[in-house]
Amino acid sequence: MPRPIQAVIHQPALANNLEVVRRQAPASRIWAVVKANAYGHGIRRVFAGLKAADGFGLLDLSEAVLLRDLGWQGPILLLEGIFQAQDVPLLEQYRLTTAVHCEEQLRMLELARPKGPLAIQLKLNTGMNRLGFRPAQYRAAWERARTMSCIGSIVHMTHFSDADSKRGIAHQVEAFEAATANLPGEVSMANSAAVLWHPQAHRNWVRPGIILYGGSPTGVSSDIAETGLQPAMSLHSELIGIQDLQPGDTVGYGSMFTADRAMRVGVVACGYADGYPRHAVGWGERRAPVLVDGVRTQLVGRVSMDMICVDLTPCPKAKVGTPVTLWGHGLPIDDVAAASGTVGYELMCALAPRVPTSVATLTTADAV
């Protein structure tokens, strides 16, 4: 028999979360962002749950080809654009929209001389300072793109650095509007946080990512508690052993946890080789949460490669074989991430290939 650990991808949750975005931005079209293999969920697994989107946004050409192979006929956006001129024919072959964020990418399009017309999203750097033309360069870049015979539609695009924080987006919106004043074309700027909290940024297209998977843009689960978002990934295992500790007994490598009373500790078949965060805290006051048979308890000791240990004090009836939820329904992934010094995004993307993964489909009961 295989180890009892299993991940489940919930297509009904994905469809629900897409509908939440629709309600938040009813006048906008939606790029469903599925980069990084759909934030670790798997493009093949999420496709049915997200195919009501207006388009898909991703990074890799291989992911775009996969979507076409799955039957997607709508728009696909390469969020980082092309990386070499040899990619240009694939834009035509697979009918892809590409971001253009630098002089070099414009030059690639010129040199490749595609038949066109290609749809592009011209990226403006409004303060994130990763990709994009600076405001002083943007209008000239737009004029150049407009005169290129291979380019058809041009969407104005930017990305927010602080939509999930108190600083907000006003300074970036102001820079965007100044740089694009009187330039025709649609606009795409809202990420997940802006979809939820900045309706002035919704415009023609929105680009939700983490909220499609039920995670919080801020990393704080309570910030999205009233939105109706649902976790699209759950990670489950079982107790495979139980130890009865006496006061002074320690648990795990480094003896980081010391029992201050007689207590039962359960051993769970899950470790950092499965994608569970090694830095999850299992001592002190802010220990990582775990559900044992639906009851919330805490990690004890360090995370090992293949195992973790949990406090069974709230679960006196727990025994070998009792189900454990590492994250998912009833236990937000962001809560685990917060106790591990990271964010839910990273935990989603870090799910290990060795973990068996099943899909709760749109046509089956989502009961896992």
From Swiss-Prot:
The modification N6-(pyridoxal phosphate)lysine is found at residue 35. This is Alanine racemase. Belongs to the alanine racemase family. SUPFAM superfamilies: Alanine racemase C-terminal domain-like (SSF50621), PLP-binding barrel (SSF51419). CDD domains: PLPDE_III_AR_proteobact. It catalyses: L-alanine = D-alanine. It comes from Cupriavidus metallidurans (strain ATCC 43123 / DSM 2839 / NBRC 102507 / CH34) (Ralstonia metallidurans). InterPro entries: Ala_racemase, Ala_racemase/Decarboxylase_C, Ala_racemase_C, Ala_racemase_N, Ala_racemase_pyridoxalP-BS, PLP-binding_barrel. It comes from the Bacteria. Its EC number is 5.1.1.1. Its cofactor is pyridoxal 5'-phosphate. Substrate binds at residues 130, 305. One of its GO terms (biological process) is D-alanine biosynthetic process. One of its GO terms (cellular component) is cytosol. Disulfide bonds: none annotated. Catalyzes the interconversion of L-alanine and D-alanine. May also act on other amino acids. Pathway: Amino-acid biosynthesis; D-alanine biosynthesis; D-alanine from L-alanine: step 1/1.
